[in-house]
């Protein structure tokens, strides 16, 4: 099992978890609350190098986890597909370009900044499944639609 964690509200750990799943490593998890919560709760930590274990990993792509550009272009305006923009408010509004040559969003996308999915506590732990369902449903993100996040 791979347990991913970070000190950024699980933003990068979640991205890494997704990458592992995309390459077929389905035995992975994100540590809720990350390194800071682990440390603050007095859980064991070490500065020793872990002992390397020889393993063989054979990637097996999960193509259903990505949306190709051509597929995205043909899905714009399709009521069966919803684009969910989880970037920052500034990226959504186009006031922050993060180095891109253009700013803005995919037409008709729904915006829910990723911070809406974590609690406003010092560890940014994940909200409960019911809270997440309520947030998503209120934004029109429902199970019968194909959801494309970015």
Label the predicted regions.
Residues 1, 74-144:
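Positively charged, proline/Ser/Thr-rich regional signature most characteristic
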């Amino acid at each position: 099992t791979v347990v991913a964690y970070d000190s950024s509200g699980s933003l990068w750990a979640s991205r890494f978890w997704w990458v592992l799943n995309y390459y077929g490593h389905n035995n992975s998890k994100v540590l809720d609350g990350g390194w800071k919560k682990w440390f603050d709760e007095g859980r064991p930590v070490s500065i020793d190098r872990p002992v390397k274990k020889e393993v063989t990993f054979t990637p097996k792509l999960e193509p259903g986890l990505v949306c190709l550009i051509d597929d995205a272009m043909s899905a714009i305006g399709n009521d069966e597909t919803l684009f969910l923009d989880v970037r920052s408010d500034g990226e959504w509004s186009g006031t922050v370009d993060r180095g891109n040559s253009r700013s803005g969003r995919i037409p008709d996308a729904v915006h829910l900044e990723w911070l809406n999915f974590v609690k406003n506590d010092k560890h940014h732990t994940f909200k409960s499944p019911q809270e997440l369902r309520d947030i998503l449903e209120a934004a029109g993100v429902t199970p019968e639609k194909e959801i494309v996040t970015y």
